[in-house]
Structures are given as C-alpha cells and as structure tokens.
C-alpha cells in the first residue's frame, strides 16, 4: 500500500529524456539494503529476509530505482490448475438441507422448556449458538434467528449481566462476557461496567488456583469481550490485561487440545486482525471437540458439516473469480509494469476473508483490482518515476481523459490507461448497485490520493522533515485506505445514499480512523526499510523531531498507544448503538481496515508476501477443508 514517500530520482534537466524513456530498456546496478524481518510474534529479526534496492539507468541516461521485491507467487498456470467439485448442485442442495436443520435448532430454543434447554441454561445456549455460527462463517443464513435469540438474551440483561439462564440467581462470567461481546457486536446498548461484578474486594479480577476447563473457557470469553472496547472503558483494558496473562499461563499447564489451540489462535490474532474467513477456517479445526455442550440442544456435528460445506462451496466460486482476475491482470497490461509489486491474488484473498457472501463478487474483484493499481502506483511514485514525470502523471490524472496521457512516458501511458479503464469499469458496476453515477466520488478520492504523494515528494526534494501533525494528516490520505475502500463498497447490494455515504467515506470519523490505523501500523513496520532507502519521514521520525530527546523506542511506544486508542475509537464508530447509520453500511469499511491491519501485523505483508500472507492465501483460498 501507499505507505512510503516519494524520492527524487532525476534532476529537472533530465525531463526531456525521461519523457521518451521506456521501463524495459534498462541497465542495472544493484546494492543491497538490509531490512528488519519480524518473527511470527514480531520480536526478532529473520536473517534470511532482506530487501535490496536496484538502481537502473535507461538507455537515454535517466537514473531510476526499483525495489527488489519478489515476483508474483501465483502464476496463471497454477491458478488454472486448481480444481474443485464443490460447485456441483448436489453440494448446494446438501447445504440447504443442513441450513434447514440448523434453523430447527434455533427454533427449538424458542419452544417450551425441555430436558436440554430450561430456565437455568436458556441464555448461555442462545449466546453460544449465535457465537458458534458466526465463528464458523455461516451466520448469513440465520439473520432472523440470530436477532430473535439476541433479543431474548437482551430482555434479561441487567447492570449485573446475566446468568446461564433466565432464572439463575447469580451472574455467570462466561455468559456475561460472551453476551457482552455478542450483543455489542450487533449494536445492542450494553455497558462494560457489568464486568466489575467479577472483581474481588481489592478490585482485581478473581480466579481460582486450579484453573479448571470451565474457568479457562470463561476467561477466554472475557478476553474476547475485552477486545470490543470503546474509548475510556478502563474495565475493558483491565480485563484484557488480566485475561491475556491468565490464558498465557494456562497454556503452560493444559495439554495440547482443541481448547489450547483455540486459546493460541485468539491470543495470536485478537479481533481486529482475525479476519472472518480465517477465523472460520481455524474454528472448523477445533469446533465440537470439547464436551462443554454435550447436554446442549445444539447438534455440533450438523453445524460443523454445514460450515465445511459452505467453506468449500465458496472455494469453488473463488476459483472462478481468481481465473477472471488473472485474465484481467494480463489483459490490462499490468505484467508490463515490471517495476512494481504484483499482489492481485493476495488482495483478492483479503477481500475473500472479509466478504465471502456469494453475491459480493463485485466487491472482491473491485477491491483486488483497486489495491493492485494502488500498489503499482506506490512503486512508481516511490522508486521508479522521476519527480517531473510524476507531476505530469498527477496532472494528467486530474484531466481524466485518455488524451491527457499523450505527454507521458511510455510506461506511464500504460499505467494511466489501467487506472482510467479500471476505475470507469468499477463505477459502472457501482451504478448498477446504487442507481446513480459515482464517478465523481471516485475521481475525488484518486485526486486527493495522488496529491498526497506529491506533497511527500516536495518534502523530500526540499529536505523538509514535517511536524508530526503535518505528516499525520497527509499520511492518512497517502495510506490509500479511502481509495481502496470507496469504489468496492459501492458495488455491493447495500444502499449508500449521499447522507449515508458521507458517514462512511470522507469526511466521516470512521474513514479518518481507518486511514489512521493503516498509516500508523504501516509506519511501525516499514520505517526502518524506508529510512535505509533515504526516505526519512515517518510517524516515528516526525514524532521524534517534535519531541527532542525522545528515543526511537519511546516514539514506537507512543505510536503503538495511538493505534490502540484509534482501534477503540473505530470500534465505537462501527458499534455505537445510537448511530443513525446501520452497522451493515459501515461494516465493510471497518473490515477493510482489519484486512490491512492483518497485512502489517508482523511485517510489510505486501512487500514480503511469501510468509504469513502466502499461508493466508493457501489456507483460505487455495486449499479446501476435508469433509
């Protein structure tokens, strides 16, 4: 993503030469610049990971730089070789039968009390059922049933939380924590203050020394709830610290099991970087292996069978969409942009992980195309193009006419048409969904995005290190989040009239915070490599400039604290129960933020896409689950 600044690559006297230069006639000089590779936990260097910068000189004497990134990992032959039989109608029929059976499970909880559901467990049964179908990635089939179950639970919610059942005389930690999390995610007004009930007389969360499985699961629910925190909720911060420590200690004592794996997954990814399809894939592996709900009215085998089927049926759709995406990539002329990173399959994977409803093909493909273009532009502005060429390109983009590309270098002409054709194509899809032309929105986003690049170019040309405030405001735009999100969400079957769009897109708080997370988290992962390339400006360096005497470690601590605060603010913007904008209208912008955050969890997952990102592609797109 656009998370690096632009460096001047040629003097103005070279402009007349650069206009006729080609990206394909280059003489190469290489120098290696070491960069920090992060371990899986982001704590240590990986010696094998390094980044090199290639300096190239075209035949007409223009000096250029190229990032020595690894090539596209997913070639056309590999994509075409993928096979699946889960697109057959018989699998869809089997899934529909299972959907009907799961609906009966939901309905059985609404009938009269019986042996398996009664006044002493009816609340936890409902919450657990909702949580299960959501974690398994099959909740889209049960929207009415989920609402009915949560309405019932909420009707018994109080300032003391809830017990396991409506007639329970004491509050239960597992029921209350899981209820708090689930109700909050669905927009119900529930206060985190209920968690104070589970503290001892010293104001600390209480636990027993034995750490039984029941208690461990309760604390796991507490940890998951604590991640859905809003600004200023001290009890949620305390709950997160306590429960994380408790669970880490529990892992040292309990045997390897589905419970231990579930704890590791939740501690590893939390919530903001635990993408829904990724969570579904992981939860399929551990679901139904415990005995906690053996006396439940919930048939875990049916839920698991449906989850696996749905995962694989969508996998067959992913194959077709990937084939289309690869054809688009080739036909657009993208392979000729040899100076850039080609990560279209990785971007498609991110989109698949946050929107795997079949009807949202336009979103997935639009997101992959848009982010692919942003990344190529990032590399063009960051390393390959000269400042003078980039000024011409930026001005030509604002004219929005193919004839404007006539004055550009050959490689830029191709890039111009890729942007022009793709943006117009996605706008046509958006017009079908929204019933109005959205090109003006798209052009405004692209214009501001490229302007933010040019601002960074001027800073570098003049040697100016901006203040943190200057850098931060410009950097939120140059992060590319708004540009990546706007057009794809408009292709969805979700209405975005102007008054709703302004609460989701610029100038909304939701948009501002989503851009901020990408900027700040990206900087913490990229600033050392950027600095090694001579690109000094980052949130870390600008903060240190504003605060003389502050160490780099202090600056990182400050930025990480900012990220935590921004995440809580973003949670509030999504889930505020008093908001006039439905969660469904905000959810995908929020989830795009989660997807980008995941890519920077350990390292720059776009430049180094052959570790965690490759694993994500294989696990959620390439490989089906075993039935």
From Swiss-Prot:
Localization: Plastid, Chloroplast
Motif (DDXXD motif): 378-382
Main location class: plastid
InterPro entries: Isoprenoid_synthase_dom_sf (IPR008949), Terpene_cyclase-like_1_C (IPR034741), Terpene_cyclase_plant_C1 (IPR044814), Terpene_synth_N (IPR001906), Terpene_synth_N_sf (IPR036965), Terpene_synthase-like (IPR050148), Terpene_synthase_metal-bd (IPR005630), Terpenoid_cyclase/PrenylTrfase (IPR008930)
Textual note on the cofactor: Binds 3 Mg(2+) or Mn(2+) ions per subunit.
Positions that bind Mg(2+) 2: 378, 382
Binding-site residues for Mg(2+) 1, renumbered to this chain: 378, 382
EC number: 4.2.3.119, 4.2.3.120
Top enzyme category: lyase
Sites where the protein binds Mg(2+) 3: 530
Catalytic activity annotation: (2E)-geranyl diphosphate = (1S,5S)-beta-pinene + diphosphate; (2E)-geranyl diphosphate = (1S,5S)-alpha-pinene + diphosphate
Needed co-factor(s): Mg(2+); Mn(2+)
Domain of life: Eukaryota
Single GO MF annotation: lyase activity
Range annotated as the organelle transit peptide: 1-36
Pathway: Terpene metabolism; oleoresin biosynthesis
Key words of the record: Chloroplast, Lyase, Magnesium, Metal-binding, Plastid, Transit peptide
PANTHER family linked: OS04G0344100 PROTEIN-RELATED (PTHR31225), TERPENE SYNTHASE 11-RELATED (PTHR31225:SF137)
Known role: Terpene synthase (TPS) involved in the biosynthesis of monoterpene natural products included in conifer oleoresin secretions and volatile emissions; these compounds contribute to biotic and abiotic stress defense against herbivores and pathogens. Catalyzes the conversion of (2E)-geranyl diphosphate (GPP) to (1S,5S)-beta-pinene.
UniProt comment concerning the protein's domains: The Asp-Asp-Xaa-Xaa-Asp/Glu (DDXXD/E) motif is important for the catalytic activity, presumably through binding to Mg(2+).
The protein's name: (-)-alpha-pinene synthase 1, chloroplastic
Lineage of the species this protein comes from: Eukaryota, Viridiplantae, Streptophyta, Embryophyta, Tracheophyta
């Amino acid at each position: 993503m656009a998370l690096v600044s632009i460096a001047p690559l040629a003097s103005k006297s070279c402009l007349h030469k650069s206009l006729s230069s080609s990206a394909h006639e280059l003489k190469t000089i290489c120098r290696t610049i070491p960069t920090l590779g992060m371990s899986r936990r982001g704590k240590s260097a990986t010696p094998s990971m390094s980044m090199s910068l290639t300096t190239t000189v075209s035949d007409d004497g223009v000096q250029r730089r190229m990032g020595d990134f690894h090539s596209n990992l997913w070639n056309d032959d590999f994509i075409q070789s993928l096979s699946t039989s889960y697109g057959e109608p018989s699998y869809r029929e089997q899934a529909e039968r299972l959907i009907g059976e799961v609906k009966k499970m939901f309905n059985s909880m609404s009938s009269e009390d019986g042996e398996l559901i009664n006044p002493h467990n009816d609340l936890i049964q409902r919450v657990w059922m909702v949580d299960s179908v959501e974690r398994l990635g099959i909740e889209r089939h049960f929207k009415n049933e989920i609402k009915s179950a949560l309405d019932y639970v909420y009707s018994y919610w109080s300032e003391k939380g809830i017990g396991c059942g409506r007639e329970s005389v004491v509050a239960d930690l597992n029921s209350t924590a899981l209820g708090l999390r689930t109700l909050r995610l669905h927009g119900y007004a529930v206060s985190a203050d209920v968690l104070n009930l589970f503290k001892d007389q010293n104001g600390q969360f209480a636990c027993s020394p034995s750490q039984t499985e029941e208690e461990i699961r309760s604390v796991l629910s507490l940890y998951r709830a604590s991640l859905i925190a809003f600004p200023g909720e001290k009890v949620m911060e305390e709950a997160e610290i306590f429960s994380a420590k408790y669970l880490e200690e529990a892992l040292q004592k309990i045997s390897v099991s589905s419970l231990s794996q579930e704890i590791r997954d939740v501690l590893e990814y939390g919530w903001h970087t635990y993408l829904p399809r990724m969570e579904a894939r992981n939860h399929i592996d551990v679901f139904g292996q415990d005995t906690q709900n053996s006396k439940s009215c919930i048939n875990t085998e049916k839920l698991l069978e449906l989850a696996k089927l749905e995962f694989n049926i969508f996998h067959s759709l992913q194959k077709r969409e990937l084939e289309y995406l690869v054809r688009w990539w080739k036909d657009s002329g993208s392979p000729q942009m040899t100076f850039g990173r080609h990560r279209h399959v990785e971007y498609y994977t991110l989109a698949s992980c946050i929107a795997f409803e079949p009807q949202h093909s336009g979103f997935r493909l639009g997101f992959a195309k848009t982010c692919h273009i942003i990344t190529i532009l990032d590399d063009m502005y960051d390393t390959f193009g000269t400042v003078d060429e980039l000024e011409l390109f930026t001005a030509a983009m604002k004219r929005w006419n193919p004839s404007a590309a006539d004055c550009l270098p050959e490689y830029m002409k191709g890039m111009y048409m890729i942007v022009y054709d793709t943006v117009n194509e996605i706008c046509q899809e958006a017009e079908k969904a929204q019933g109005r032309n959205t090109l003006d929105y798209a052009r405004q986003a692209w214009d501001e995005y490229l302007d933010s690049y040019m601002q960074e170019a001027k800073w570098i040309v003049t040697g100016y290190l901006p203040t943190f405030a200057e850098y931060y405001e410009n950097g939120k735009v140059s992060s590319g989040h708004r540009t990546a999100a706007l057009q794809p969400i408009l292709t969805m079957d979700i209405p975005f009239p102007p008054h709703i769009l302004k609460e989701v897109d610029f100038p909304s708080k939701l948009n501002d915070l989503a851009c901020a997370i990408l900027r700040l988290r990206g900087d913490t992962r990229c600033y050392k490599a950027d600095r090694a390339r001579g690109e000094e400006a980052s949130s870390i360096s600008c903060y240190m400039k504003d605060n003389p005497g502050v160490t780099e470690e202090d600056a990182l601590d400050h930025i990480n604290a900012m990220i935590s605060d921004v995440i809580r603010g973003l949670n509030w913007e999504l889930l505020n129960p008093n908001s006039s904008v439905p969660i469904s209208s905000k959810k995908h912008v929020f989830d795009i933020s989660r997807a980008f955050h995941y890519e920077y969890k350990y390292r720059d997952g776009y430049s180094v896409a052959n570790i965690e990102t490759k694993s994500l592609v294989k696990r959620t797109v390439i490989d089906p689950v075993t039935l």
